[in-house]
Design a protein with these regions (language model features):
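Conserved catalytic core of the tyrosine transesterase superfamily
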Residues: 1-196
Length: 196
C-alpha cells in the first residue's frame, strides 16, 4: 500500500488556483479523491446525478456493484461546482458519456489513466513527489481515522466489505486494537465485580 501523505503535503497539492477548464476539472477530481476517499475507478464512473451538492454527499457504486453514500467536504463541493460551470464546454450531447461527471477534452468520460497522468502533472508543476490517486484515498483514510478513531466509519466510507481490509489499509497495529478492545468490551475490562 502507498504511504499516507501528511496534511501539509495534501494542502500543497490541492491549494492552487486552476488555470483553464482542464485544471478546474483536475482540481475537482483531486479534491474529491481526498475528501471522500473514493477509488480511482469510482471517480471515473461517477455521473452528474450521483452528487447531491446541497446535501454534500455522493452516491458511489463500488466493488461488487455495492452502492454507498459518502460525505463530500466543502472544498471539494466548491471545486465540483466550479467544474460544473466549465463542464458544459466539453459536454458532447451525442456521446454515451454525456452524463459523466468528469469528461476528457473530447467530451467523453475520463479514463483512469488520464486521471493518473493529470495528477502526475499537477505534482510536477508544484515540485511535489509523485502522488497517485490511491495515495489520496489512503491519506483520506489515515487522516479521518487519526482524527476520529472510528474504524467502522472509515470502513463504511471506503466501501470495504471486511474490516480487516481497513485495518491493513490504515496500518493499525494490534496494540491500538487491543487498547480499544480493553476499554470498550465489558468482559475485557479489568477490575469488574465478576473478576476472581
Amino acid at each position: 500500500l502507498p504511504k499516507a501523505m501528511d496534511a501539509d503535503l495534501v494542502q500543497r497539492l490541492l491549494d492552487f488556483k486552476p488555470n483553464g477548464l482542464i485544471e478546474v476539472r483536475d482540481k475537482a477530481i483531486a479534491e474529491l479523491l481526498y475528501s471522500s476517499g473514493l477509488r480511482l475507478s469510482e471517480v471515473c464512473t461517477l455521473d452528474v446525478q450521483d452528487l447531491e451538492l446541497k446535501e454534500r454527499v455522493c452516491r458511489v457504486t463500488g466493488k461488487g456493484n455495492k452502492m454507498r453514500v459518502v460525505p463530500v467536504g466543502k472544498k471539494a463541493i466548491q471545486a465540483i461546482r466550479d467544474w460544473l460551470i466549465h463542464r458544459k464546454e466539453l459536454k458532447n450531447s451525442k456521446s454515451s458519456s454525456s452524463e459523466a461527471m468528469f469528461l476528457n477534452n473530447k467530451g467523453k468520460r475520463i479514463s483512469a489513466r488520464s486521471i493518473q497522468l493529470r495528477l502526475e502533472k499537477l505534482c510536477a508543476q508544484r515540485g511535489l513527489p509523485g502522488i497517485n490517486p490511491h495515495m489520496l484515498r489512503h491519506s483520506f483514510a489515515s487522516h479521518v481515522l487519526e482524527s476520529s478513531g472510528d474504524l467502522r466509519a472509515v470502513q463504511e466510507m471506503l466501501g470495504h466489505a471486511d474490516i480487516a481490509t481497513t485495518q491493513i489499509y490504515t496500518k493499525l497495529d494490534f496494540q491500538h486494537l487491543s487498547k480499544v478492545y480493553d476499554s470498550a468490551h465489558p468482559r475485557a475490562r479489568k477490575g469488574t465485580k465478576n473478576d476472581n
